[in-house]
Every structure is written in structure tokens, then in C-alpha cells.
């Protein structure tokens, strides 16, 4: 690797909109995110399942399939 062309890698504080903070490595000192693993529905188990009432479901209902 060439010397002097790589950015300085330092500890960064990641701040989420929910108030959660944690440290990681980055070229920036502070990173702000809208969603993290503490508030994301997939990780918290509060995931909403959208019912897919699309064309296939309407077809199956109309013709008595399924």
C-alpha cells in the first residue's frame, strides 16, 4: 500500500434518532442515523406484516381457488 493516501481511521460515535449511541470505526468522528438495531422493527420483533391483497389473491378469490 502507498503511504499517505489512506484516510485516518478513528473511533466514531454513532447516534440514532431513538437516542441510542454506540462506538465504531470510521473516517468521521460522529455519524447520525435514523434507525439502528435498537429501534428497527426487524430486530425488536415489532414487525408488521402487510397483507398482500394483490391481483393473484383477487383472482383466487374470484374463481374459488385456494
UniProtKB/Swiss-Prot annotation:
Record-listed Zn(2+) binding positions: 16, 18, 36, 39
Alphabetical keyword list: Metal-binding, Ribonucleoprotein, Ribosomal protein, RNA-binding, rRNA-binding, Zinc
Gene3D superfamilies tied to this protein: Ribosomal protein L31
GO MF terms held by the record: metal ion binding; rRNA binding; structural constituent of ribosome
Impact upon substituting residue 39 to A: The protein does not accumulate and cells grow very slowly
PROSITE patterns given in the database record: RIBOSOMAL_L31
Top-rank taxon: Bacteria
GO terms under cellular component: ribonucleoprotein complex; ribosome
Induction: Only accumulates during exponential growth.
Cofactor: Zn(2+)
GO biological process: translation
InterPro entries xref list: Ribosomal_bL28/bL31-like_sf, Ribosomal_bL31, Ribosomal_bL31_A, Ribosomal_bL31_sf
PANTHER family referenced in this protein's UniProt entry, alphabetically: 50S RIBOSOMAL PROTEIN L31, CHLOROPLASTIC (PTHR33280), LARGE RIBOSOMAL SUBUNIT PROTEIN BL31C (PTHR33280:SF1)
UniProt similarity note: Belongs to the bacterial ribosomal protein bL31 family. Type A subfamily.
Function statement: Binds the 23S rRNA. While neither of the L31 paralogs is essential, this protein seems to function as the main L31 protein. Has a lower affinity for 70S ribosomes than the non-zinc-containing paralog L31B (ytiA); is displaced by it to varying extents, even under zinc-replete conditions.
Protein name per its UniProtKB record: Large ribosomal subunit protein bL31
Organism from which the protein derives: Bacillus subtilis (strain 168)
Amino acid at each position: 500500500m502507498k503511504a499517505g493516501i489512506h484516510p485516518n481511521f478513528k473511533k466514531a460515535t454513532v447516534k440514532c434518532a431513538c437516542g441510542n449511541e454506540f462506538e465504531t470505526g470510521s473516517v468521521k468522528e460522529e455519524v447520525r442515523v435514523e434507525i439502528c438495531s435498537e429501534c428497527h422493527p426487524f430486530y425488536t420483533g415489532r414487525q408488521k406484516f402487510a397483507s398482500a391483497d394483490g391481483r393473484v389473491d383477487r383472482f383466487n378469490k374470484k374463481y374459488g381457488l385456494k
